[in-house]
Amino acid sequence: TGLVEKKGIIYIWTNKNLKSRNLEIKVRKELGIEQKLLNQKEVLDLEPNLKPVFDAGVIYESAMHARDPHGILKKIFKLFLERGGKFIQANIKNLEQINKNETAIRSENDEYKFEKTVVASGAFSKSLTDQLGENIPLDTERGYHVHFKDCDHLLSRPVIFSNRGFGIPPMEQGLRVVGTVEFGGLDNPPS
């Protein structure tokens, strides 16, 4: 199976939430996003393993989804190395923009200087970019999900239950049920 699939994405809802869905559909149409409204039967024809607890849906046929985000990162990393990138595993303490073309990166033991630097430290990126004078409005987003192994065959594409606030994308690791995130900062315990 590929790392990324273009099978579309389906949003489903109940009739009691139709008003907000109509606005969403209208805005996306105005933005030129291709979409196809589906009744319950049409959704079930595409995804027969869904329980019919919804009334209608919309499919975005040109949408793509990642079946293996970790695999994607590994391929990008491999390509980075093949194109001459360096990987240095170190605990970074400080970044400093020395001049327009040079950044110093200091670890506990060494200092490295580079023409181009990418800060990709997840939740810890802001504390590093702040040292460069970049005021990036970045906070930590914690996402919560559950995987059901060996169930990815039950859906052929992601399905989002709009008014219930969760989605189910099929992934290499199984079906992932996602929906809850919090902007809790680095110091707060998980909720």
PLM segments and residue spans:
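Active-site substrate-recognition segment that forms the wall
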Residues: 3-4, 94-97, 101-102, 111-112, ...
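Short beta-strand/turn micro-motifs at beta-sheet edges
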Residues: 45-49, 164-167
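Helix N-cap/beta->alpha junction signal
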Residues: 14, 69, 121-122
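Dinucleotide-binding Rossmann-like beta1-alpha1 core, especially the glycine-rich loop
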Residues: 1-40
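Helical element adjacent to the flavin cofactor pocket in flavoenzyme catalytic cores
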Residues: 19-29, 53-116
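Residue-level signal for well-ordered alpha-helical positions
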Residues: 24, 49-50, 131-132
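Surface-exposed helix-capping loop/turn segments at secondary-structure junctions
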Residues: 1-5, 31-36, 82-86, 114, ...
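C-terminal catalytic lobe of FAD-dependent flavoproteins
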Residues: 35, 42, 69, 162-163, ...
